[in-house]
């Protein structure tokens, strides 16, 4: 059975120490989250560099606070340093957190936003050059210029039946 852990410290240094100790005790990976504390990219980097073998995952990166190209850039970069690979966990968070805490539009349709974001992230990670003026994000010949070390699985945080259906 695979057993992973979530970040527990209040500082990146505490997280690094905790992750190293947990891996020695049998944990096989680390998951990082983001609301208004530690930045998840920094936390994921620390986790990846603290592990000897384990995977790192995001639980979750809110899709409204980073565009799909930036998400793909982060995932590809983290896949290069996480010894067991990187899992990109995405979600829509909540309207209160996205609009009230992050001062950005939550959107009218979380399902459409998720479908669009996952499609674009996967296409970027697969090396595709994208021109798109449909939906939330507009791109003009955008392309990821770094390759992931491992194929990056995309996990979805689902809060209703239609999102569960999309997640598979």
What are these language model-derived features?
Residues 60-70:
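Structural motif corresponding to the early beta-alpha repeats
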Residues 48-49, 69, 146:
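Short glycine-biased active-site loop of nucleotidyltransferases that positions the nucleotide triphosphate
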């Amino acid at each position: 059975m695979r057993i992973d852990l979530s970040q527990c410290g209040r500082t990146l240094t505490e997280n690094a120490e905790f992750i190293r100790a947990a891996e020695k005790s049998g944990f096989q990976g680390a998951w990082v989250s983001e609301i208004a504390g530690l930045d998840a990219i920094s936390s994921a980097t620390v986790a990846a560099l603290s592990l000897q073998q384990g995977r790192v995952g995001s639980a979750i990166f809110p899709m409204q606070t980073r565009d799909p190209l930036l998400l793909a850039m982060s995932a590809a970069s983290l896949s290069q340093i996480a010894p067991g690979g990187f899992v990109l966990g995405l979600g829509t968070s909540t309207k209160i957190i996205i609009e009230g805490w992050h001062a950005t539009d939550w959107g009218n349709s979380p399902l459409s936003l998720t479908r669009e974001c996952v499609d674009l992230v996967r296409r970027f990670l697969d090396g595709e050059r994208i021109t798109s003026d449909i939906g939330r994000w507009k791109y003009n010949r955008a392309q990821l210029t770094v390759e992931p070390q491992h194929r990056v699985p995309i996990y979805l945080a689902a809060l209703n039946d239609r999102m569960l259906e999309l997640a598979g």
